[in-house]
Each structure stands twice: as C-alpha cells, then as structure tokens.
Amino acid sequence: MIETMTRFISVPALVLCTLAACGSGASSAIPTAPGQPGKPGLGINASLQGRRPFPDDNAWNTPVDKASADPNSDALIASIGLTKGLHPDFGASYGGGPFGIPYVVVSGSTPGVSVTFDYADESDPGAYPIPVSAPIEGGSSSSGDRHVLVVDRDHWKLYELYAAYPVAGSVNWTAGSGAIFDLSSDALRPAGWTSADAAGLPIFPGLVRYDEVVEQGAVLHALRFTASHSRHAYVAPARHYASSDTSSNRPPMGMRVRLKGTFDVSAFPPSARVILQALKTYGMILADNGSDWYISGAPDTRWNDSELNTLKTVPGSAFEVVAMGTLVKN
C-alpha cells in the first residue's frame, strides 16, 4: 500500500466565479436538488448540461446540512486553521493563464491508449480514452501533480491519472497512478487503494465547474479540499490515507466539513453564493495533502477572479465537521 502520497501545490491567488448569466442575483433561491439533465457536451471544460456524476444516493451527492456534527469538530477545524481563509484553487488567470484541475469530455468512440503506471498494484489497468488534446494540470511542462481527467459521456465513465506524461512519439502515456470510475455506480475502490488522488477518491466530482456555477446556477455535490496535515486514517468514502501522524485531532482523509448554516452569505456576489450554498448543503471532502482550506475547481478563462477572491474572507471557524463513520487506521 502506498502510505505517503503527499502533494503540496502552491497555487496563489484565489479566484471565484461570476454568474454573468444570473442577472442581478437578487433572488436567494439557489437550487439544492438536481433538475432534468441534458446530454453533456464535448471537449475541454465542456458542460455536463446538468448531468450529475454518480447516483443520487452517492456520498458526493448526499446533503449533509441536517447531519449531526462530529463531537471532535472544534479540535479538527482548529488543526486546519480557524483564521485561515477559504481559498479557491482555480480561476481565469495566474502566471499567464487559467489555473486549476482541467478536464475533457469525450465521446464513447474515442480510442483507448495504453498507460504504464508507477503504482500499478493500486491502479486500474485497461485502455484510457485520452485524446491528443487532453489538458494536463499545470500545463505540459509542469512538474506538479499533472492530473489528467477524462469523462466518457456515452459510457458514463471517468478516467483519471496522477503524474501523467505522454510518451514521446506515441499516443500512449505513463502515470504515477490511475483510476477508472463508473459514474452510474456507487462502487468504491478496494480498501487501502489510492487513485489519482491521495484519498483514493475521484477528483472530477468534487471540482467547482463553470458550467454548474454559471449555466446551472447551482453546485449540487460536495467539493474537494486539501489540508497541510492529515491523519494516518481514512473514513468513507475515502479508501486511502497519506500520513504517518496518528493524532486524533488531525483530519482523516474523507472527512467532510460543511459551512455553518448560520454563516451569512447575503453580501457575497451571486457566483460566490452558489459555491457557499453548496458548502452549506453538501460540504467538502478532504481528498489530499496540500494548502489548508484550498478548494478545487476547473480552470476556465470565463471565471471572474475578482468574484472568486471574495471567498477568501470565509474563515476556517465558519466550518464544522460532519459526524464521521468508522475510521480505518491500517
């Protein structure tokens, strides 16, 4: 088992999205349940047209606003940071271009390619339908996590790679690890397995995406976030830990936090309110080691970074831990 896949990414400025399509944003009635979805588009940053990954009863899609708080919530939140602000780790422009974790939507006829894994014993074998145009997190010359996320809209499957590199002169790839998820199933990875993420979770379902925030006007799932220190333990839906720290006051992978219902979001711009409402209703799940309170999203030149930056004013003290299930420590 891979015990340490610690990934620290320092992506500066936080950015938040704009709801250009939401008019004045005078209405506070943000949807909290899915409507009738359409057929997802194709390409980089393609809209899913309201289609939500995984069944409605999946952990990512389960509302937690009425769930009990964990009895150790105060200590766990303090260990991440009471005064540190929320930080959207995505946006329209930083260092000459958009930043975040990109994705691409492909059709079911996209040819599969071979991927060679460093951690093959915890990676899913098989052909991965990675198009030539597939974006790499951080860009083709980056040295960071280099995630590659591919959604097959017709077979409704998700393919994810960590530390992905195209093989020169070939259509094939190498990667640190990889995972394939059936988006119509609740199946988890084997216990103790990593994925393209440290916690053994899928990445794509936890991203803040432009099509949801702006086109749909609602984010109807939990989000993905990171913390600089985690525990040598995990809780469902996570399947893997990435730390040797055994303190009960450190957050385990898979821990879910939510924005307190009493936190006033009325002064935030419309796009920020959509994201904050998602954090109240669905919360966010600890998925990797990284900068404290960084939430993940897809890069897009259409984001309004000024609006995204308003999220930085939300302190860690505004969150609480949702009651956790059984901790897995070995």
PLM feature segments, named:
Residues 1-12:
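Bacterial N-terminal signal peptides that target proteins for export
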Residues 18-21:
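C-terminal motif of bacterial Sec signal peptides marking the signal peptidase cleavage site
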Residues 23-26:
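Bacterial signal peptide processing site
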Residues 30-330:
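Short, surface-exposed polybasic-aromatic patches that bind anionic ligands, especially phosphate groups
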